[in-house]
Amino acid sequence: MAMMNCDNLQNRLAWRVLPAALLASGVLSLPAAAAQVAPPVYQPAEEWQFTVSPYLWAAGIRGDVGHRSTGTQFMKTDFSAIARDLDVAVMGMGEARKGPYSLLMDLMFIDTTTRNGLPDGAPASRLKVDSRTVSGFLGGGYTLLEEGGARLDATGGVRVWYSSTSLHFQGGIIDGASGSDRATWVDGVAGLRGQYALTPTVRLSAWGLAGGGQSRLDWDAAALLSWEFTPGFSAVAGYRAMGGDYRHNGFVYDVVQQGPILGMNGRF
C-alpha cells in the first residue's frame, strides 16, 4: 500500500495558494484602457445588498485517502473521466454587503466514485473509492481598497469539513476487502478577494484563502468571469481549486479538488 510523503505534498499544496492570492490582488493592476467602455466606479452601499450564486462544479479529485483498517491509498479522477466518476458536484455562495463590510457564506457538496489500478506487487489489482465531501465556509470581509472599477477585500472565517469515504479492493489476494470511515473537522482561513470591472457588464473576480486548524492545511482559490446579461443577474464561468490535508486516528483525507465552474448570480 503506497503512501505519499505528506511533507512534500503539503509544501506543494501551499505553493498552489500563492498564485491565486496574487491574482486576487493583481486584478487591481489591470489597466483601465483595456476596456472599450469606461468601467463603473464602485459606490459603497448605504443599505444592505445581497448576492446569491448557485454553481455547477466539474471537479476532478486527486490525493490520498485512508482508514485505520485499509491503510492509505491514492485516488484520482482526471478531467477526461469526470463524466464517468463524478456523481454530484454543486456549490453555492452568498454575500451580504453594507459599505466596506461584508458577510460571506460558501457551501459545497461533491460525491464521486473513482476506480484506479494498483501497482504491481500490491495485494489487489484495483481500488474503488466512494467519496462524499461537504464543506461550508462562514466569514466576513473588509474593503481595503476601492479605486475606479477595482475593489480588494481582506477576508477571513471558519470552514467546516465533513468527509465520508469507502474503499473496496478488487482482485488479488484481498479481493472483496473493504473499509469505510468518516470525519468532521474545522479550520480557520483568511486571504484576499478582488474584483475588477472590465466594462459596465463584464467583471473579473478572484480569491485566494489559506489556513488550518484541525487539519494541517486548508486552501481555496478561484478566478471567475461574469457577464451581467440583465440588471441584477449575471452568468458566471471560471475555475476553482481547493484542498485539505486532515489526518486523525488513521483517517486520512489529503485531497485536491479542482475544475471549471458554471453558474449564475443574482443581486438584490
What are these model-predicted stretches?
Residues V202-R216, A241-M242:
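Transmembrane beta-strand segments that form the barrel wall of outer-membrane beta-barrel proteins
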Residues R84, G148, L209-D220:
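Solvent-exposed loop/turn segments connecting transmembrane beta-strands
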Residues M1-E47:
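Cleavable N-terminal export/targeting peptides
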Residues I61-D87, L107-S135, W161-W185, G213, ...:
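Extracellular/periplasm-exposed beta-strand and loop segments of Gram-negative cell-envelope proteins
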Residues V52-P54, G92-K98, L138-Y142, G156-V158, ...:
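Residues on the lipid-exposed face of transmembrane beta-strands in outer-membrane beta-barrel proteins
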Residues L217-R267:
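Predominantly the C-terminal beta-signal and adjacent terminal strand-loop region
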Residues A33-D106, R267:
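Short glycine/proline- and aromatic-enriched beta-strand/turn motifs that initiate or cap beta-hairpins
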Residues P100-M105, E147-A150, P200-L204, G232-A235:
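Repeated loop/turn-to-beta-strand initiation elements of outer-membrane beta-barrel proteins
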